[in-house]
Amino acid sequence: DDYLIEKYPNDPNRRVKSARIDSGDLARGSKRLRKALDAVGKPYIKLVASNGLDEKKIANMELYEHAHFDSYGVGENLITSASDPVFGGVYKLVAVKQPDGSYTPKMKCSDSASKAIIPGKKMPWRLYDENGQAQCDLIAMDDEVIEAGKPVTMVNLDSDAIERTVTITPTKVKKLLVPHVLNGQLAIELPSIAEKKAYIAKQLTEETWESELRLECPHKHYVNMTPAVAECRSKMY
């Protein structure tokens, strides 16, 4: 205690605002340090944890070990994407543009219906309920128009789903496909860091269900297709 009083004086000009624990048993260390700091009248000192942290380690310390940290410093696992170091995106041909400007749907055949791509030029939409919460995403043909306030029939992408078809009436709809590069040129104004943060925050609060954010067994985001898309896929498969 005498060491803490000397190390962290109450002089406002020299007051330490936080203490970082970076090694050893982090949760246990936070409890011991919090108890010691409180005992010498320094509850204002915040505790920060770091050292190879990720969302699972943080959840374990908070939920099961009852750590006394005020904030967590995540670096390595935030920028390296340790669980998914490689983006496995693959471009597949879905349509060929004809001289008259129309598109002919194309499809890569597969032995598995679940792996067969969805043919045709398409436009994804997001549908919202009366509270402004996103209900699901909908894959439509590019020339289809999805309107707010009008019933929309959707077909489940999962062929084994109990309810294959459902109809809802969204109060708001939004196109999700926004061109960023056209003819090799940037087509949008790049957002600032603050705008990016605000966009992500809105995605997590209004565009995503809480059940989709669970660390364990998260709920899958609903993605359906219009009957026109389902029919095109069925005819070509």
Where are these regions (language model features)?
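Short hydrophobic "strand-cap" motifs at the C-terminus of beta-strands
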Residues: S50
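Glycine- and Gly-Pro-enriched alpha-helical subdomains that act as flexible
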Residues: D1-R32, A36-G41, L47
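Gly/Ser/Thr/Ala-enriched C-terminal appendages of enzymes
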Residues: G24-A27, L33-I45, L53-Y237
